[in-house]
Amino acid sequence: MKKLWYLTIALVLILAALSVPAATAEEEPTQYTSGDYRYTLRLDETAAIAKYTGSASELSIPDTLDGHAVTAIGDKAFASCGSLTSVTIPDGVTSIGNSAFYSCDSLTISTLPDGVTTIGDYAFYSCNSLTSVTIPDGVTSIGDYAFCFCRALASISLPDSVTTIGDYAFYFCGSLTSVTIPDSVIEMGSNPFLECDNLTQIMVSPDHPVFATVDGVLFNKSEKKLVCYPYAFTQTSYTIPDGIRSIGDRAFSSCNALTSITIPNSVTSIGNCAFAACNALTSIVIPNSVTAIGDGAFSPCTSLTSVTIPNSVTSIGNSAFENCRSLRSIIIPEGVTSIGDNAFSLCRSLESVTIPDSVTSIGNRAFSSCISLTNVNIPDSVTSIGKNAFSLCTSLANINIPDGITSIADNAFGCNSFTSITIPDSVTSIGDGAFDGCNFLTSITIPDSVTSIGDGAFGDCNSLTSITIPDSVTDMGNNPFAGCKNLTRIIVSPDHPVFATIDGALFNKPEKKLVCYPCAFSQTSYAIPDGITSIGEKAFGSCSALKSITIPDSVTSIGDGAFDSCKSLTSITIPDSVTSIGDSAFYWCTSLASITIPDSVTSIGDGAFDSCTSLASITIPNSVTSIGDRAFSRCTSLTSITIPDSVTSIGSSAFHSCKSLASITIPDSVTSIGDGAFDSCKSLASITIPDSVTSIGDRAFSECTSLASITIPDGVTSIGYGAFESCDSLASVSIPESVTSIGNRAFSSCESLTSITIPDGVTSIGDGAFKSCDSLANVSIPESVTSIGKYAFAECSELLTLTVVRNSWAASWCKENGMNYTYTDALDWLKQ
């Protein structure tokens, strides 16, 4: 769980680092190039380094570039320079920009000149190898997350010039054992030493004007705030001193030794994530003086079984107790007006909750996935219940919706154990999936006040047998009753202004759309009435009795998932009037053996025929220009298919796992083959890729175990990740001169491949590109190659010698990696 917490925090930090809004083109300063440096000119005609493009390991940045003195290291200037081990910055530099050395994984030492005054946010973020850094006397501020994730940083000396230390500046510096805060520091952000695993000592002079340590814990004296409780402290209990008014953001975060904490009556606020991930903490009493509990304050305290919230508290922050999975009950005090988003979500042991009359709003996902919660009384004061507020509360059997509620939010009550629900007359709208998955809900009354019902609002309510749509409903999303397996009756008055039922099926009259065909109808065939122009999304979803459907010539579109999971449907004729087949339109129609697609259709949606396991053949008309992602994925009976000349692209996983597909014709019109397009087509013995194709996606032909040979056309420039991985029968492959890169694992585990000629022009061979090619005996590498990934030829048991050009980069690589090699000079290579 702690690893998950770390990963979550790391992801949040990374996203924060990368989410700087891009400047518009006119705002971007002109960049100049000098050797391996790109730079911009400042107002005083000095240079700010914008980007280093070299690959040096030990680097001394020059004093000048094209005669301009270097005075600044710009934002992200050296970010992700993985080869950089040490850097010396010239004396004229005064500022280190945001993310300047971000993720320089190999950087072990950095010397900052005396003139530097500011170290930007994320400046040395994730420099995992950085063991020491000297901060000169001129530095006044250290930015947010400046040395975050510098795990090897064992010591840091802060000079007397520093006045400001940013939020989480030394977060996760796992080797740091002690730190001294100089008297000059007057401002400190949220816990700068968060999760410093070995930090046991924070030193502050007794005369410090702002900060103090008491029993090793860092406080802000002027604000009377607890800033940091050292992560490595081993004591199991702690009492916060009297007089402290606030607990800072993440002050105790991840202090896993603590089982109990005593908070004095002087404390009025608990900061964001103040006790986050204190996983040994079993109980806590919040004193009457506290008025606010911050976002994520106790999330996730996985051992917390009880918490006392006093009446003084008026707000409970977002995620305040999220994932406190041992918490069994909670009483929200009078005075609280809102329950934040995710406030108690994932509290899996929570059995009861008391919500007072003062509460007016319950946030999004506030109690989501509280799987032990059996009963909730929502007071009449509540006027807003957020999206997913009680979703996946699988034990919740009943709940009252107060009269003040005007809308039921999306997925608000996806509660499996609901048996009945009363929707008050105040409600005007029912959101998407509002009661989705309420499997035991046998009946529901929609009041006359409701004007709109969202997509799948009552989807998969499998005990629902009938429903009445009041005349007030004028707007209805895609099949609100999709997957209701026992629904036999939808009741609509003859005078309804918008909707009507014909032979039990629900229609939208103005739109001439079939909205819902009840799942539990027992007839095996159905003819859609003439005049209907569209079949709505999931209109026939999970209608397992239907074997045949007649679609009239008036229909022009078939919606997404229209016939999803119609497992008895054996055949269907699509009329010439239809122009589009929606995503997943016939998904999992496992009995569908044949289908005729008319010339009027121009696109086949994503997953349109996915998992139609009985579909043996299909003709795609010349009108179709694109085949969507997963369009025919897992059509395991499909033996052959002809793609017409009109098609220009084959989507990702379009024919994935079509295990019986033995042949396919790709026309000259196709320019791209998507990722995994023919992945695991185990019967595919041959395929001709036309010259028009310029890109072959990742894993496009992986695990095509019968494929014996392949010719890659001249227009292709790169072979994607795992493109032909595990093609066990592949004995020969022709790579054209247009290819410049061979992706990671591109031909990995091609056990029958005996030789490969890599053409001149290829510059990179990816990690594991030919790994485990057991029969590979001959490989020639041209002079153009400048990069060979790890394990590119690993576990090639027959490969004894590589053929390389004398004095080439590949020859040096062979020497460095202990590979046997023989020479062919560049002239011989060109003759080949």
Predicted regions and their residues:
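Bacterial N-terminal signal peptides
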Residues: 9-17
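Bacterial N-terminal signal peptides that target proteins for export
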Residues: 1-9
